[in-house]
Each structure stands twice: as C-alpha cells, then as structure tokens.
C-alpha cells in the first residue's frame, strides 16, 4: 500500500507509474479525499479541544460564583457533545474510504522495468542450457502421464471436478521427490529457514500480501471465514506482521513446501488439459524480509536460488523481466523463469520472483530499527517460487522422455526415488 503523504508530494510520479501499468490517473481524487478527511479530523480535534477548555472554564466560573457564565459554558459543552459523534463518524467513514482506495492501487514499478502492455513486452534477461535434441516426436505431459498409467484426470474429475489431477505410484513419488529436493536445496545450501505454516488464513493475512480486497475472486473462502492460501507467500510474509525487527537480524529468509489453492477465475478456456493450471498444486515458496538498502540485491539472489533448481535438474530455461503491464499488483520488479516444454514447443512460467519494496510492509505494519536509530522504517519484502512442483514435474516428463515412452529420472532426484532410475509403463 502506498503512503498518502508520499502521494501528496509525488502526485505526478504516481500518475506516471499508473500510466505505465495501463491504469488511469488517481492522484487528484485521492488528494481531494485526503483533504476532506484531514479537514474533518481538524474539526474533531478543535471540538475536543474546545470541549476540554470549556469544561475547565466552567470550574473556574463556579469558583468565582459566576453562575451565568458557568451555565453558558455548560450549554456550549452540551452542544459540542451533541455534534461530536457525527463528526467522529464522518472521520471514520472518510478514513475507511481513503484506506480502501489506497489498498487498491498497485505498486510503483522500478525505473528499469520495461514499459509495456502485456507479456508480449517482456524482455529476455538471459537463458541457460539448450533445447533437447531427439529422434522421437515430443509429447505433452498429459499424454506421457496417461500412457505411463500414473496420471488420471478422469478419476480426479469424479472426485473434484475440472482442474484436478490424481497421480499414482511412480509419478506420485516423482512429485514428492521434486518438492523434497527443492526444500533441501533451499534450506541446506541457500540459507532459507523451513517453515510449516497453516493452509488457512484470516482476512488480515490476505490483505497484508495484497490478495485482498482486489483479488478476492481468485481465492477460495471457507464458510468459517478463512481463506485457503493461494501461495505460501501469504503465511511466510505475514510471519513478521506487526513486528519491529532488529536490522542486524535481517535478512530473514523463509521457505515452505505447501499446496496452493486458486480459483482460476480469469482463466476460463486456458490450459484446460493437463496439470498446467490447477485449482490445487504444490509449490516451494521463497520469502525474504530485508532492510530498504538490501532488497534489490536480494531479488537477484532469490532469482538465482530458483534458477539453481532448474540447473540441477538439467532443464533449459530463460529468465524474463516482466513489463509494467504484465507485472503483479504488489511487485516493483519481477523476473519470471520460463522452462522449455518440448510437448508444447514453447516456454512456460515455472517461477516468478518479485521485489515489493515496502508495499506489503505498510499493509502489515512490519518495521525494523537500526542499532543506533530511535525511529523505525518499513521492511522490504520479496517472494518467489522455488519452484512450482507440478510444472516442474511437467518439464521433467517432457524433457526426459525416451524413445520407448519411459522417462529418465534426473540425477538430482535419484536420492529421493529409492533407486528408481527410469519411470516405465505400469504393468
């Protein structure tokens, strides 16, 4: 969330940033609303001050036996007490209206983010590896999985409807191996602390990371009022909600392997076959909490950690710098890792790593204090996938497919597969 004081002082900067995102200018409406709110706040404070002063004057008048003045002052106090609740309610309404408006404004892109309308304006940062060269015709993951006999969309549909998958036997183990491999890599080599956190959260947590109020339709809400997490970013980032951290202890780096739940409300007709776009999927999430000076460098580090997963698995990928029109609501800059899928003959996103500055921290009221500082500053937050497990499984199936229809297990996963080196058709 942006600071209204900053908006008052940087109205043109805000409108220019919104224009880069393809949004209409908002600064003047926000400033007008804030001026109205500040005016009523001043009125409330003036009434409260006059009420308190008049109350003291009543005592002085009574001491001087000036009954006429005392009665006049009592009438003034009574009038203030009558008017004050309405003014306080107006202040509350205007404050809520302003906060709601501020909560719906996207973050300000960094200056080096490419300006564009959508994904077609994203820029290739670099790539790694090469596309596999085969004699056989590539297949899509759902063809491979069904032919192996371990991927069942029909049974999943009977259980839960569309956009779900049942994996069994060797593919279920491969999915588990991928998640465990990612978690071990990030905790053992990359310095992240593993966290086991709830899969259901309150409104406040979803607001803190920016899912609410603007993107409520993208998530699932229980009848009890909890939300199923669309990503572990929600829980990991909110671990510091309301805290004042010691700068010396930053950065904090958290990781979690969890299911994620998404309604895919805006994805009708897209990726309807297979596992690419599911209502439920596993993901290894990375979150960093830094001071203001370190967040840009941490963004590069986090992205490199996610890249290492794909390098260890021998998967060709490219890193894209997202344009302003394709970047997420809370991000100041985002790198997408796109893995090569031979079956689709294209690159698909497998990880998204974003630096959010203090945007989420303001919503969560998460701060830090330097060793010699009296005041506090908002922390900076970063999040990324390290990586999406289901999409990584898709990439392994399509890139490690053999001529006979079997799939070779990548070397990095062998310690997790109980000696299984090749996934073959079910007997």
UniProtKB/Swiss-Prot annotation:
Gene3D superfamilies: Bira Bifunctional Protein, Domain 2, Serine-tRNA synthetase, tRNA binding domain. L-serine binds at residues 231-233, 285, 385. It catalyses: tRNA(Ser) + L-serine + ATP = L-seryl-tRNA(Ser) + AMP + diphosphate + H(+); tRNA(Sec) + L-serine + ATP = L-seryl-tRNA(Sec) + AMP + diphosphate + H(+). It holds the Pfam family tRNA-synt_2b. GO terms for cellular component: cytoplasm. Its main location: cytoplasm. Its EC number is 6.1.1.11. Pathway: Aminoacyl-tRNA biosynthesis; selenocysteinyl-tRNA(Sec) biosynthesis; L-seryl-tRNA(Sec) from L-serine and tRNA(Sec): step 1/1. GO terms for molecular function: ATP binding; serine-tRNA ligase activity. SUPFAM superfamilies: Class II aaRS and biotin synthetases (SSF55681), tRNA-binding arm (SSF46589). Coiled coil: none annotated. One of its GO terms (biological process) is selenocysteine biosynthetic process. ATP binds at residues 262-264, 349-352. It comes from the Bacteria. Belongs to the class-II aminoacyl-tRNA synthetase family. Type-1 seryl-tRNA synthetase subfamily. Homodimer. The tRNA molecule binds across the dimer. PANTHER family: SERINE--TRNA LIGASE, SERYL-TRNA SYNTHETASE. This is Serine--tRNA ligase. It comes from Rhizobium rhizogenes (strain K84 / ATCC BAA-868). The gene is serS.
């Amino acid at each position: 969330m942006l600071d209204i004081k900053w908006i008052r002082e940087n109205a043109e900067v805000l409108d220019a940033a919104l224009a880069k995102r393809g949004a209409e200018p908002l600064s003047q409406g926000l400033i007008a609303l804030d001026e109205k709110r500040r005016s009523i706040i001043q009125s409330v404070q003036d009434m409260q001050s006059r009420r308190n002063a008049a109350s003291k004057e009543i005592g002085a008048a009574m001491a001087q036996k000036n009954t006429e003045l005392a009665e006049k002052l009592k009438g003034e106090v009574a009038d203030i007490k009558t008017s004050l609740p309405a003014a306080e309610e107006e202040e509350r309404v205007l404050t809520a209206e302003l906060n709601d408006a501020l909560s719906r404004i996207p973050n300000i892109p960094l200056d080096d983010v490419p300006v564009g309308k959508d994904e077609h304006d994203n820029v290739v940062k670099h790539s790694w590896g090469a596309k596999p060269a085969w004699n056989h015709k590539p297949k899509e993951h759902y063809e491979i999985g069904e032919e192996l006999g371990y991927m069942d969309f029909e049974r999943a549909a009977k259980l839960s409807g569309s956009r779900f998958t049942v994996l069994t036997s060797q593919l279920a183990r491969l999915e588990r191996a991928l998640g465990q491999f990612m978690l071990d890599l990030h905790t053992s080599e990359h310095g992240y602390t593993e966290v086991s956190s709830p899969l259901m959260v309150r409104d406040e947590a979803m607001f803190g990371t920016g899912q609410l109020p603007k993107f409520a339709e993208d998530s699932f809400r229980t009848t009890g009022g909890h939300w199923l997490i669309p990503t572990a970013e929600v829980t990991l980032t909110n671990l510091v909600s309301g805290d004042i951290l010691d700068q010396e202890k930053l950065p904090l780096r958290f990781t979690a392997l969890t299911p994620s739940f998404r309604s895919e409300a805006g994805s009708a007709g897209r990726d309807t076959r297979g596992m690419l776009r599911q209502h439920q999927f596993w993901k290894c999430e990375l979150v960093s909490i830094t001071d203001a000076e370190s967040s840009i460098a941490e963004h590069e580090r986090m992205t490199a950690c996610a890249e290492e997963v794909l390098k260890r698995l021998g998967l060709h990928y490219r890193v894209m710098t997202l344009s302003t029109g394709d970047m997420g609501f809370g991000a100041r800059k985002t790198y997408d890792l796109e893995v090569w899928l031979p079956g689709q003959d294209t690159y698909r996103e497998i990880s998204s790593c974003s630096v959010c500055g203090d945007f989420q921290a303001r919503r969560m009221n998460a701060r830090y204090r330097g060793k010699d500082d009296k005041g506090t500053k908002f922390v900076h937050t970063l999040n990324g996938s390290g990586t999406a497990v289901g999409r990584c499984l898709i990439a392994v199936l399509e890139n490690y497919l053999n001529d006979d229809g079997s799939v070779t297990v990548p070397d990095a996963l062998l310690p997790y597969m109980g000696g299984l080196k090749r996934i073959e058709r079910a007997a």
